[in-house]
């Protein structure tokens, strides 16, 4: 699946040109269609598109520079897989871990834009992300994180310890 199919759109070229309003509408419809709270049966979620994939697709296609690079990769037969800046996937263990005075953990990764602490992930982010995986049996979870100073995104995968 590529970013266009994830959002329920046809692949380029688009005639007429795909507008930002079209993209935003497709994004909202994809979120509603695939959100666990909106599905009729919890089992249906396992076959749906992950919310993080929808968010990543929208982030790429709504940025004109990233969209051009992505469209070029599709044209060149790359099927959009890991194309363009900001589409890297990392394991949580690859990020620098820090603990604050209250015992809360945060993870950091430098961004290609040059910002040393560009990507920041907190325990709260991970806890909030868990609601998307309730009742779903997967080996790892993932969350999309945007750089704090630019438009690049990464996907962070992590395992969850059973309590």
UniProtKB/Swiss-Prot annotation:
Question: Looking at the UniProt record for this protein, which Gene Ontology cellular component terms does it annotate, in alphabetical order?
Answer: cytoplasm; nucleus
Q: Does the keyword section mention Nucleus?
A: yes
Membrane-crossing ranges are: none
Q: Where in the cell is it found?
A: Cytoplasm; Nucleus
Enumerate the UniProt keywords alphabetically: Cytoplasm, Iron, Metal-binding, Nucleus, Zinc
Molecular functions per Gene Ontology: metal ion binding
Start and end residues of each J domain = 2-74
Q: In which pathway does it act?
A: Protein modification; peptidyl-diphthamide biosynthesis
Q: Which residues form the DPH-type MB domain?
A: 89-159
Q: Please indicate if the UniProt record lists Nucleus as a keyword.
A: yes
Q: Where does Zn(2+) bind?
A: 111, 113, 147, 150
Q: Which Pfam families match?
A: DnaJ (PF00226), Zn_ribbon_CSL (PF05207)
- GO biological processes: protein histidyl modification to diphthamide
Say what the protein does.
Required for the first step of diphthamide biosynthesis, the transfer of 3-amino-3-carboxypropyl from S-adenosyl-L-methionine to a histidine residue. Diphthamide is a post-translational modification of histidine which occurs in elongation factor 2.
Q: Which PANTHER family match?
A: DIPHTHAMIDE BIOSYNTHESIS PROTEIN 4, DPH3 HOMOLOG-RELATED
Per the entry's comment, what about the domains? The DPH-type metal-binding (MB) domain can bind either zinc or iron ions.
User: Belongs to which family?
Assistant: Belongs to the DPH4 family.
The name this protein goes by in its record: Diphthamide biosynthesis protein 4
Origin species: Yarrowia lipolytica (strain CLIB 122 / E 150) (Yeast)
Organism placement in taxonomy: Eukaryota, Fungi, Dikarya, Ascomycota, Saccharomycotina
Q: Which gene encodes it?
A: DPH4
